[in-house]
């Protein structure tokens, strides 16, 4: 048995999975869950649901990028149109141009650039780079998507910082820096 943890902290139990019977559940995988709430209440769950559709969200770790890996990680243009933190994840809504060819895969990463000069770093923030490798795909169609990056491997650094400062090589404005402050719990 499994259940879904929703972003606001509640739990959803999938009582009826008829529509998604072949969905492979992976612990820690973020997804959009389309469901219909069932009337019967289940103890320990805020929602009891019939699952209509599950759409996985690209879910990755933050990568420490040594200088020799910069080429394979890529630095092609991409827009970060929205950033927000949910639980242990940084979510980035993005846009990039592509050919609409399913055989042409792009790669997205959020990296700690070990070769950074520190020139644009903000000392009170964890400095990261949102990287895109288009693998020379033709730039014909503007596409959008969502990626979630686990914050667990920078959790210790974040304790001493105000938030994140993220470098993005944008589609239209060149290099941009976006900051997101992290709300600290007062103990």
Task: Give each language-model segment a name.
Residues 1-187:
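First exposed extracellular module after export/assembly in secreted or surface-exposed proteins
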């Amino acid at each position: 048995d499994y259940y879904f943890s929703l972003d606001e902290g509640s739990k959803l139990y999938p009582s009826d999975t008829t529509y998604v019977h072949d969905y492979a559940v992976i612990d820690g995988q973020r997804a959009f869950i389309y469901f219909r709430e069932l009337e019967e209440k289940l103890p320990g769950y805020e929602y009891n649901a019939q699952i209509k559709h599950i759409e996985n969200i690209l879910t990755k770790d933050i990568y420490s990028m040594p200088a020799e890996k910069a080429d394979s990680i890529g630095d092609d243009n991409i827009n970060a149109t929205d950033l927000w933190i949910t639980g242990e994840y940084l979510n980035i809504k993005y846009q990039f141009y592509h050919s609409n060819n399913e055989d042409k895969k792009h790669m997205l990463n959020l990296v700690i650039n070990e070769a950074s000069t520190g020139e644009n770093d903000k000392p009170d923030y964890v400095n990261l780079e949102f990287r895109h490798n288009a693998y020379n795909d033709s730039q014909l169609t503007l596409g959008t998507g969502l990626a979630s990056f686990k914050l667990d491997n920078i959790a210790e650094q974040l304790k001493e910082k105000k938030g994140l400062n993220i470098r993005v090589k944008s589609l239209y404005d060149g290099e941009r820096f976006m900051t997101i402050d992290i709300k600290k719990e007062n103990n």
